[in-house]
Amino acid sequence: MKFVSLASLGFALVAALGAVATPVEADSLTAGGLDARDESAVLATYNGKCYKKDNICKYKAQSGKTAICKCYVKKCPRDGAKCEFDSYKGKCYC
């Protein structure tokens, strides 16, 4: 009985080592269509106008609708001042 369990344990260990030691091809991800997108450093900014009372920025989004975001770090200096929304960082700058 001990010999059978020892043999099956040894077989499982050898199979696991074989799976771990199998080399992975470097091009296997790109061949399967799983390559990384080249959009990681693309900065899309949208210009708009800020409003001092609520400290918000209103801008036209990509969909064409008016979007609103709260100004980040600096307060809006006056109504109608220039602001921009950075879609990469997800923050508004007034």
Curated annotation (Swiss-Prot):
Transmembrane segments: none
Keywords: Antimicrobial, Disulfide bond, Fungicide, Host cytoplasm, Secreted, Signal
Cell location: Secreted; Host cytoplasm
Signal peptide: 1-21
Disulfide bonds: 50-76, 57-83, 69-71, 92-94
Any one biological process term the GO annotation gives: killing of cells of another organism
Pfam families (alphabetical): Antifungal_prot (PF11402)
UniProt xrefs under Gene3D superfamilies: Antifungal protein domain
Matches recorded under InterPro entries: Antifungal-protein_dom_sf (IPR023112), Antifungal_prot (IPR022706)
Family recorded in the similarity comment: Belongs to the antifungal protein pafB family.
Protein name: Antifungal protein
Biological source species: Aspergillus giganteus
Origin organism lineage: Eukaryota, Fungi, Dikarya, Ascomycota, Pezizomycotina
